[in-house]
Structure formats: C-alpha cells, structure tokens
Amino acid sequence: MSIKVIIAGFKGKMGQAAYKMVTEDSELELVGLLDPFTDEKEVAGVPVFNAKEELAGLEAHVWVDFTTPKVAYDNTRFALEQGFCPVVGTTGFTPEQLEELITLSREKKLGGLIAPNFALGAVLLMQFAAQAAKYFANVEIIELHHDQKKDAPSGTAIKTAELISQVRPSKQQGAADEEESIVGARGADFDGMRIHSVRLPGLVAHQEVIFGSQGEGLTMRHDSYDRASFMTGVNLAIKEVVKRSELVYGLEHLL
C-alpha cells in the first residue's frame, strides 16, 4: 500500500523539490497540496487547497511541511490533530512548542519529525561536531545560506550548538575584556560559543564548525549545492514516521 502524502508550501523551492521526489516514487502517493496564495485548483490531478482547514478529513498518512516559521507550529499541530504524521523542514520552533507537539504526538500515537536539516551529510556533521567538542572546548559555528532565508541563525546551527553544549562544559570564549566596536561583530552567543550567519545570493545551505586548541585547529564543513540534497532525508522520513508513535526533533533519531 502506498503512503498518501500532503505537501504544505508546495510552491516554494523546497516544496517543489519535495513534489518532484514524491511524484517520482512509486511507494508514495500525492493526495493534496497546500499553498495560501496560489489560484491553482489542481496540479496533475492532485487537488490544491488554500487553507489547512480544507484538508480536514482527507485520507492521508503524512503531512510534509516546507512553509514559514510563522505558520509551521499551527500547521504541525493541525496535522497531528487530523491524524497525519508530520515531516517538517520549517524551522523556528521554540522549545515549548516542540514539547507541546511531542506530547500531542504521544497522545495521538503518531510518529513525526521536525528536522532543521534533511541532508544526510549535515546530520553527520552535527554528530561529528558533538564528538569533537568532547576534546575541543573552543568552537565557533558559521552558517551560510541564500539571501531569502527568513530566520537567523539557521535551525541547523542552533541544533549543532545544542548538541555541542550537551558534551562541552559551559565556557565563555574570547578575551574576558573583549569589546565589540560594532555591535554583533562577535556573532550570536550560545552558551559561550559564537554563531555567525552569512546571507548571500548564490548560496543554498552551508555550515562550518571551527574548533581551536593550543597549536592546532579542526574545521568541519558541509555544503548543500542543490535542494535535491535534502530529498533523500525527506524520503526516508516519510517512510519511517508512519512506523513510529512519537514525534522526534532531528533526522538522526530516524537513522
């Protein structure tokens, strides 16, 4: 039996990549598309909806969400309430929102995933960085994205910092008396480590994690040159969440 999929935000670049991936996989069936701004009523025989409420009662298994931080929480909550397993690539959730959604998924006995990054290489980078942080306490993160990205720092950078902070003693980096001649020059402060965000046209999604110690340095980097790099992870997530009974944060929990 094929897995029936809804894509929210299908007109965006990630949504278009997800549309292509789902329609090319014989194990998946696209049953609904959501975008509040389109005038289209259907695409290749698949119905298009302008409001999530119009999807209530639709027979579907998985809700794929590539929308905006402004609506992602409400969308994910709606999906769970309707019995859809959410696979969410939109970032910007607060810790409180994540906890609420995880609790709701347990009540509904539905699997789900919220992931800051679906590229397998990026997931590995986060894991490798957490391993290195046990031995290199001084670290800074540089994330680079296209200039249309709405949030900063990226969800991937925040997730990386969270994983590092779990194994690294809290430490304020840099000189104790350092001063910024321009506010923000040292980047965002996360538990003493610094996160820097770059936004430029031509970029897709890139991240460096730079460690420093006496007499040596270690740099880890991942690059997504095309949004197709995320689709292996999205495909894996769609097929895995239907087997689960709880929402998780981070693709690594499904690998």
From Swiss-Prot:
Enzyme class: oxidoreductase
Annotated residues for binding of (S)-2,3,4,5-tetrahydrodipicolinate: 146, 155-156
Biological processes per GO annotation: diaminopimelate biosynthetic process; lysine biosynthetic process via diaminopimelate
Alphabetical keyword list: Amino-acid biosynthesis, Cytoplasm, Diaminopimelate biosynthesis, Lysine biosynthesis, NAD, NADP, Oxidoreductase
Catalytic activity: (S)-2,3,4,5-tetrahydrodipicolinate + NAD(+) + H2O = (2S,4S)-4-hydroxy-2,3,4,5-tetrahydrodipicolinate + NADH + H(+); (S)-2,3,4,5-tetrahydrodipicolinate + NADP(+) + H2O = (2S,4S)-4-hydroxy-2,3,4,5-tetrahydrodipicolinate + NADPH + H(+)
Assigned EC number: 1.17.1.8
Amino-acid positions noted as binding NAD(+) in the UniProt annotation, renumbered to this chain: 9-14, 89-91, 115-118
Pfam families listed in its UniProt record: DapB_C, DapB_N
Pathway terms, separated by semicolons: Amino-acid biosynthesis; L-lysine biosynthesis via DAP pathway; (S)-tetrahydrodipicolinate from L-aspartate: step 4/4
GO CC term (a single one): cytosol
Main localization, broad class: cytoplasm
Location in the cell: Cytoplasm
Residue positions of the active site: 145 (proton donor/acceptor), 149 (proton donor)
HAMAP family assigned to the protein according to its UniProt record, in alphabetical order: DapB
Function: Catalyzes the conversion of 4-hydroxy-tetrahydrodipicolinate (HTPA) to tetrahydrodipicolinate.
Listed name of the protein: 4-hydroxy-tetrahydrodipicolinate reductase
Native organism: Streptococcus sanguinis (strain SK36)
Designated gene of the protein: dapB
